[in-house]
Amino acid sequence: MNTTATLHPITKLKSQIEANLQWGESSVWNNYDFEKLSEQIVEKTSVSLSVSTLKRIFGKVSYKSEPSMTTLNALSQFLDYEDWRDFLVKNPVNTETPLP
């Protein structure tokens, strides 16, 4: 039986955004929350991410493609990383995380 799981880097990014905002888990966010997040991202990074894009990232809307590099860079910069690459370097994926 496999008792390890890989925590996807985008999952880490989302968790850090949730912790930074202190609005609770994104699974309970509503449209207003995504609008406020979009506004905060523009204010901090000068990059406009639509509410629809944010909902896709946070799993509120079904979408099979990976986010664009522009989106990942903006979300990383929102958390005070230089860009997505800097986020990845400073948040290595732990492939040996035990499952509960």
Task: Show where each model-derived region lies.
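Defense-system signaling and execution modules centered on TIR/cGAS-STING-like, death/scaffold domains
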Residues: 1-2, 80-100
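Recognition helix of helix-turn-helix/homeodomain-like DNA-binding domains
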Residues: 20-29, 40-67
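DNA-recognition element of transcription regulators
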Residues: 33-35, 68-71
